[in-house]
Amino acid sequence: MRVLHFFKTYLPDSFTGVERVIHEIAESTATLGVSTDVLSLSPRPAASPLTIGTHRSHQSKQDLYVASTGLSRTVFADFRRLAAQADIVHYHFPWPMMDLVHSLANPGKPTLVTYHSDVVKQQGLLRLYRPLMGHFLSSVDAIVATSPNYVQSSAVLAQYRDKVSVIPIGITDVPPADRGLVDRLRARVGSRFLLFVGALRYYKGLPFLLEAARSTGLPLVIAGAGDASGIAEAKLGNVTVLGEVSDAEKLALLKLCTGFVFPSHLRSEAFGVALLEAARAGKPMISCEIGTGTSYVNLDGVTGITIPPADPAALAEAMTTLWTDPARSEAMGIAARRRYETLFTGKAMGTAYAALYEKLVAAGRGRR
């Protein structure tokens, strides 16, 4: 079976949240007989397809980038060509250009969309986009949400309950962190600290985290790409900023840390792959209750602590709890690892998607 994934960005240009999910799906379904192509946009597209692991990355020329939306003239032809070779087309929402391409370059194949997030930030443009979005979601054969929490809280998904299913995001297990790297980072940041890892974006709740760090005085390490000027301006001696780190460095930091803090306060944080990585590492977590998958990964009182969003006092209290109660923190970390093994492995996600692909392709044959 051949599957075409379609999203606005992908490797080698970008490899953050959704791109990592696409990569995991492609690699985890490869062992189940699925051949994968990924089409995305790039300001500097590669002249020929790139091999990424077991799958192929294709790039169309990005002509404009407006309101977090890449636009392209050539992607229509590229999409038609690749869709013609595929058995099924797998979209990743939200991206308005994708909806337009689907509508104008009808793939004529079974289609599904992984619904990663509501449109949260661009509320003004949402009024203009809503008709196209409605047409797109009505016309695809299946919609996949990444957590039952998001299905329950999304007003958009409520309109399509008859074709919505849940496949949680999963990640592959990894070998233990490199000992030499662990030692080098220990020399730099210490062996006991709370950790935040993630892109430094508007919805990550970093101002509240800094306020909590100020009030508690607890050592905090922040690692991630983005504008760190606000962190620097806070001038907190107990906060260490590392900038973007490699996957190997991330594993080492997770090995060292006492607990993982993930204070995202807006629904733009639809799941939180970084939380999965912390659970995989067996670390207790702190996250906010925002009606999304973050509270599906992190169960309050079981794998960690959930708090109200944008509440630095509650965040400070949760951080202090993890810091001052090692026995409870360890128990939560063990439970987090167990929950990862039960629900959130890459194999589990790949198996579920492969089964859905087979179901949709079989249904498509039945309609012919």
Model-found features: residue ranges?
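Conserved donor-binding/catalytic core segment of Leloir-type glycosyltransferases
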Residues: 4, 182-217, 221
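N-terminal strand-loop element at the rim of the active site
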Residues: 6-16, 20-70, 226
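Short His-centered aromatic/hydrophobic patch
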Residues: 91-98
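A short, active-site helix/loop in glycosyltransferases that binds the activated sugar's phosphate group
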Residues: 138-166, 171-176
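Acidic donor-binding loop of glycosyltransferase active sites
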Residues: 194, 255-270, 283
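Nucleotide-activated donor-binding/catalytic signature segment of Leloir-type glycosyltransferases, i.e.
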Residues: 230-251
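Short hydrophobic beta-strand element within catalytic cores of glycosyltransferases
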Residues: 280, 284-288
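Conserved acidic donor-binding segment of nucleotide-sugar-dependent glycosyltransferases
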Residues: 299-312, 319-326
